Design a protein with these regions (language model features):
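Histidine-centered catalytic micro-motifs
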Residues: 4-14, 38-41, 130-134, 194
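N-terminal active-site segment of His-dependent metallophosphoesterases
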Residues: 1-31
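Extended recognition/assembly regions associated with phosphoester-bond processing machinery
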Residues: 5, 34-35, 46-47
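Histidine/acidic-residue-rich catalytic or RNA/ligand-binding cores of hydrolases
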Residues: 15-19, 48-51, 139-146, 166-182, ...
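Extended substrate/RNA-proximal surfaces in nucleic-acid metabolism proteins
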Residues: 2, 42, 47-158, 162, ...
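Alpha-helical scaffold segments that flank or form the walls of functional sites
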Residues: 22-36, 56-63
Length: 237
């Protein structure tokens, strides 16, 4: 399958990643991508950049080495109410807005509470992609999540990093298989994300491809196959 984009990556600015914007852009171009998303963590993650970083993104060129860039954030879902750790003023400054649950800053609840919070994030007018919903950090009911994504036009990510054996996320494989089967059933598009924290890992979808094959997931529901398909699928702000 041809891949033209990767929308979930991190640079040094996130505090625990290892490449610069230029290094990420160059690596993406060398891999033949046409579009790269750089999505730094918001303040709920220790060591990440301050909000002023996002307000100054206007100084960064949106094309380097022949590849287009979209600069944004991976915003934290904090609790079962769907509270986010970025305000509207910050989100307006971004090219792309992802939201996800992270162990370091999530207030865990029962499955029903976690699912409600996730659905609220999916319905948020500024959130365009949900990162690694299947990584098992919070227990979720996936069917309401998939149906909300279909209703709101928010893309659900299948995340390669969470599937790596070294990450130790024991439920990630079965969870992502369930999400893919539900998205196939309800004809909900997905986005593949590398979650690269170093340039060499950009557009690495090795473990995702195994799940796509196992579920016989339709290529026409994978938005990474072309920039045009992705942009047409992206929730408009």
């Amino acid at each position: 399958m041809k891949i033209e984009l990767d929308m979930h990556t991190h640079t040094l600015a996130s505090g625990h990643a290892f490449s610069t914007i230029q290094e990420m852009a160059k690596a993406g171009a060398e891999k033949g991508l046409k579009l790269l998303g750089i999505t730094e963590h918001t303040p709920g993650i220790p060591g990440t950049c301050d909000p002023i970083y996002f307000r100054n993104l206007h100084v960064v060129p949106r094309q380097m080495y022949g590849i287009d860039l979209m600069l944004g954030a991976e915003i934290n879902i904090l609790d079962g109410k769907g509270t986010l750790d970025a305000d509207e003023a910050l989100m307006k400054k971004l090219d792309i807005r992802i939201a996800g649950i992270h162990l370091l800053c999530y207030e865990h609840g029962a499955v029903e509470e976690n699912t409600y919070g996730m659905v609220q994030a999916i319905r948020h007018p500024y959130i365009q992609i949900i990162s690694h919903p299947g990584d098992g950090t919070a227990k979720l009911n996936f069917e309401p999540m998939v149906l909300a994504a279909k209703e709101c036009g928010t893309l659900l990510e299948i995340n390669n990093s969470s599937l790596k054996p070294a990450r130790g996320k024991v439920d990630a494989r079965s969870n992502n298989l369930e999400i893919l089967r539900l998205c196939k059933q309800y004809e909900v598009p997905v986005i593949l994300g590398s979650d690269a924290h170093i340039s060499f890992d950009i557009a690495n979808y090795q473990y995702i491809y195994e799940l796509l094959q196992e579920t016989e997931f339709p290529e026409d529901l994978i938005v990474n196959r072309s920039v045009e398909v992705f942009m047409n699928s992206l929730k408009k702000i």
